[in-house]
Amino acid sequence: MGRDTIANIITSIRNADMDKKGTVRIASTNITENIVKILLREGFIENVRKHQENQRFFLVSTLRHRRTSKGVYRTILKRISRPGLRIYSNYQRIPKILGGIGIVILSTSQGIMTDREARLKKIGGEILCYIW
């Protein structure tokens, strides 16, 4: 049985966010680095640094905790395409999350990107996760 690194990232970030931890440590792979770069660019995490421990690399991400008048705002991450059920979409049918407020992360032939970038380039791909 293989590992689902994308689900591991999402679960680690979600658990750290719910537990109000400041940082989360994720094993570094090409996919995880690209997803974390997107989260950093979109403002869901504050910063990222690469850390080496016993010849293994990890990404240490600082989470962004936003406060509203009703309490702490939680970032919701949801895995869509998984190893047992892959979900693909062309660029015209990529869903808009909360009317465009949230983002969809896709794996395309040109790399991992957000739904907005994929629509601009007019390419579809595998829908990895939703974030809002």
Swiss-Prot record:
GO terms for cellular component: chloroplast; ribonucleoprotein complex; ribosome. Coiled coil: none annotated. Pfam families: Ribosomal_S8. InterPro entries: Ribosomal_uS8 (IPR000630), Ribosomal_uS8_CS (IPR047863), Ribosomal_uS8_sf (IPR035987). One of its GO terms (biological process) is translation. PROSITE patterns: RIBOSOMAL_S8. Its main location: plastid. GO terms for molecular function: rRNA binding; structural constituent of ribosome. It is found in: Plastid, Chloroplast. Keywords: Chloroplast, Plastid, Ribonucleoprotein, Ribosomal protein, RNA-binding, rRNA-binding. Part of the 30S ribosomal subunit. PANTHER family: 40S RIBOSOMAL PROTEIN S15A. One of the primary rRNA binding proteins, it binds directly to 16S rRNA central domain where it helps coordinate assembly of the platform of the 30S subunit. Belongs to the universal ribosomal protein uS8 family. This is Small ribosomal subunit protein uS8c.
